[in-house]
Amino acid sequence: TETETTSFSIPKTDQPSSPKFVSGQPNLIFQGNAYSTDGKLILTEAKQNTVGRALYSAPIHIWDRKTGKVADFTASFTFYIRPNSDSQVVADGFTFFIAPVDTQPRGDGGLLGVFNREEYDPTIHTVAVEFDTFHNQPWDPDYIHIGVDINSIKSRITRPWNPHYDTYSIAYIAYKAATNELDVTVTYPNSRDYATLREVVDLKQIVPEWVRVGLSASTATYYSAHEVYSWSFHSELGGTSSSN
C-alpha cells in the first residue's frame, strides 16, 4: 500500500498572498467559543469561563493496526495571547491536541478545553501539547510552562516557558514514529528566546487509528484572548508492513 499523507496550511505556505483565516473557515470544525474572522482564528475572547476549539475537519489516519505503522507528523502555528487590559494576570493557555474523531470540548480554565480532571483517564485517548500561562493547583508546576499531556491535564513533562505578550509566538511540533519522539519548540520573531522539550510518546497505546487534530484555549476567573494567525500540519503514514 502507498504512503498516506494529510496536509493543510492556512494560509497556504506556497501562496503567501492566499487568504488567511476567513469567516467560517471551510476546512475547520469550530467548538465552544471559537470562530474565525478577518485573518485570524479566535479560540477565546478576553472573557471569563470560556473554551474554544478548532479541529481540522478531515479525520487523520495516525496509525495502522494491520501494518503496525505509525505516522510521522509536523505541526506549526503562530499564536498571540492578548492579555486582559484590566488585569496583569494571563490565563489559561493553548493546546495542540490529538483526539478521537468525535472529540468534544471539556473543562475550561486550567483544563484547557481538552481534559475534565487531573486523574489519568485512558478512555479519552488524547495527547495534548500545552502552552500554559497560569499556575493551576494542584497539578501544574509553579512556573509558566510548555508540557505534554497524555490522558490527563497533569503533564508528563514540563519545561519553563517565558511567553512574550507583546508579539506573536511560533510553535513547532514534530513527531518521529521510529523513535516515538515528540519535539516541541516555541520561538518569537526578533528574539533569541525559546522554549523546547522532547518526550517519548507511544501514540499506538494512546489514541485510536483515526483521529482529529485541533487547537484549543480556555479561560476561567482570569482570562486572555487567544488568537491564531496561521496553522499548518503534515502527516505521513507508511504503507509497508512492519513484519517485512
From Swiss-Prot:
Q: What organism is the protein native to?
A: Lathyrus sphaericus
Q: Which domain of life is it from?
A: Eukaryota
User: Sorted alphabetically, which keywords does the UniProt record give?
Assistant: Lectin
**GO molecular-function term, one example from the UniProt record:** carbohydrate binding
PROSITE patterns in the cross-refs: LECTIN_LEGUME_ALPHA, LECTIN_LEGUME_BETA
For this entry, the protein name equals: Lectin
Q: Does the keyword Isomerase apply?
A: no
User: Disordered: where is this region?
Assistant: 1-20
Pfam name, any one: Lectin_legB
The UniProt subunit note reads as follows: Homodimer. In contrast to other Lathyrus lectins which are tetramer of two alpha and two beta chains.
Q: Give the family this protein belongs to, as stated in its UniProt record.
A: Belongs to the leguminous lectin family.
